[in-house]
Amino acid sequence: AFGRRRVSLRSPIRIPREFGRPRGDDELELALRPDPLIWDGRFVNNGWLQETPRPVTKLTWDNAALISPATAQKLGVENEQLVDLTLPGRSAKAPVWIVPGQADGVVTVQLGYGRRLTGRVGAGAGFDAGALRTSTDMWGATGLEVIKSYDRRPLACTQDHHSMEDRHLVRHA
């Protein structure tokens, strides 16, 4: 049969320091996620996927800095307003998209856009959120600084009625 083997339950993988450190009340957190359709950018040159609305935001052809209504009010920003997302030693310029249900104090950006080498379809689509990543901050970081500008970048959204016929947004506790 088989010989005895000694097994350790300790993993050699370390959790990045940002996920172990609680953020302060005024500190913003960055969450990096793959785009639900073009993933890490490998499908950025597929026009059908670009035209498909993203599940929550209904955005097409672009990525944006997703923030909650309360965070947008606190920062004084509006939809389509450009902001600089800055972490120590790295930054990216992104348009804002306000998303009800997004966690307060968290800015989510989707990866896969802003590629320099792509085909005709994907050229010029979105911003490079990968510029905010490091090997220790692959999926998120705390200490994000958001610097607003007065420039705007139009975003394509397939939602016809932003207020949904004057109905108030669904509130949750």
Positions of PLM-derived features:
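A cross-kingdom feature strongest in bacterial/archaeal respiratory oxidoreductases
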Residues: 1-173
